[in-house]
Structures are given as C-alpha cells and as structure tokens.
Amino acid sequence: MFVASLKSRFLNVLKSLQNHFTPLKVVLLYHAVQAENTDNTFNNIAISLANFKDQIKHLKKHINIVSFEQLLQAKKDAVVLTFDDGYANNLLRVLPVVEAENVPITIFISSFFMDGKREFWWDELAFYVTQVSVQKNHSETEKREMYNSHSSKIMPLDQLEKASYIEELFLRENMQLPFREEFRPLSLQELKILCTHPLVTIGAHTHKHNRMALFGKEEQHQDVFDNIKWLEEISGSSPKLFAYPHGGKTAFNSISKSVVKELNFSHAFAAYSGRISANSDKFALPRIHVGNVKGEELI
C-alpha cells in the first residue's frame, strides 16, 4: 500500500488510481537519466542518477516492478518502467541500475536520431534558448515563451526541416550546435547492446518523432513503418509495443490509432496519467510521468 505524501504529485496520482478490489497496475514514463540534474529541456524530462536509484529502491519495497507482458497477468499491484526516445544514458546510466536491482525496462526508440551525431532537436532548442536568455537577461517567463514559440513552429515541420530551423537559429547568433554526453542519443552499437539484453524490451516510437496528429494518414503510416523496418534490421525482431511521440491527448488522434493497429502492434502508450485496467484502450494506454524527485517522495 502506498504511503500518503503531500509533497508528491506523483503519489497523489497513484493514490487516486487505487482500487481496493483490483490490483493497481501502472506504467511509468521516463526519458533521460543524467549524472546530475542538468536538465534544461523546459519539459522536465530528465532526472538525476541519484534520484533514479532511490526511486527504484523505494518502488521495489512497495510494488512489483514487472515487464508489460507480466503486468497484463498480474494479480498484485505492479508497475512497468518505460523510457522514451533513446538517450545514450539509458544504456550508460539506467542499465547498470536495472541490472543491479534485476528489474525489466522498456525503451521506445525514435530511429532517425540513432546515429549518435546530433542531440534531439528539443534539447538543441533548449540549449539555444538558455544561452540567448543569459546574454539578453531574459526572465524565466521570457525563456519559456521563447522556447514555446520556436517549438510550435518546429513541430509541424519534417525532420530535415526541423534540423535546418535549429541550425539557422544557431547561425544567427554565431553559436555552435551542442553535443553533450548527457543529452546525446544512442549510437547504433549502443542500441544493439540494449536489443540483446534480457531485461530490456525495445518498442517503437516513430522514425522522426513527429507529433502524429499534425500529419495526415500517409505521413503517419510512413513514419511508423520506417521505424518498424529500421528496428527489425537492428534487432532482428519486430516491435510489438508502441509509444506516441509527445504523447498527450492532442499529440495523436484516431488516425494515429488506426495506423498503429494496421501495423500489428499489440498495444500503444500515451503520456497522460491513469491506471491500466481491463477496460483500458489498448491503443491509448496511460503512463505516469516521473519527475526528478527522491524515492520517498514517490512512496
């Protein structure tokens, strides 16, 4: 049974989902785990390694950490750990922790980025906004507005256009594109290690990480199809689990769900809070985003 904690929005979500007559089944959403709290993405998607270790230890004391396949059959409270995008720190920092604790994880890969040569565009944009804001003495509100303004313009673009947009921003300010160890995507060789690891399940996350609802069916289908074929070539097997990029309720639509069904995924995950039940939509399963907090603030 989870212990009440006023500090934790995460815990409040879990408590609101509990039902004394059925087991609590939830899926947690992570992205990057960094050596320290160096996240500047404006999206709160990175947590420190120390907090991640603490979270796993505390979770293990109170709930079973299982694979998604095991969650579907679970008779007791259970939780699944998922990671989106394909950050290199999923191998370098997360894997040693899950090996030590012997817990399974699922990583959803956006294949376009897996050459290890550039950061994800949202991290590049965050770096740009942070540096420019320091030079111009922007307030936190102004920084947020700048990031959101550029992000809204970038979202509808194709991936190559996204990259060009970012490059133009940096060129305009005579800045170099960053390539930071804590933010870089997996290399192909690193991904292959994860693909063969017994504690890791690899899922699909589109090829280009487009916000699917902004595109028509043909573009959505191609983006997911390319991701599947790329992952098949790298791993030797076809992914059965899918996660919608960005993941909120407006990030995908009925067309997105039909594409995922047509391409033979068994389940698809969103990024809004909720529990998994027999009545859950298999192609819009909820996940709870985990913040950069200590384990005791979770449970």
PLM segments and residue spans:
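C-terminal active-site subregion of NodB/CE4 polysaccharide deacetylases
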Residues: 1-82, 89, 120, 196-197, ...
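Metal-dependent polysaccharide deacetylase catalytic core of the NodB/CE4 family, i.e.
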Residues: 34, 101-250, 284-285
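Glycine-rich active-site/cofactor-binding loop and its immediate structural neighborhood
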Residues: 80-82, 99, 104
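Generic enzyme active-site microenvironment
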Residues: 82-83, 203
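A metal-dependent hydrolase metal-coordination microenvironment
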Residues: 83-85, 125
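Short, glycine/acidic-enriched loop or turn micro-motifs at the edges of active sites
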Residues: 87-88, 208
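Aromatic-lined substrate-binding rim segments of carbohydrate-active enzymes
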Residues: 89, 97-99
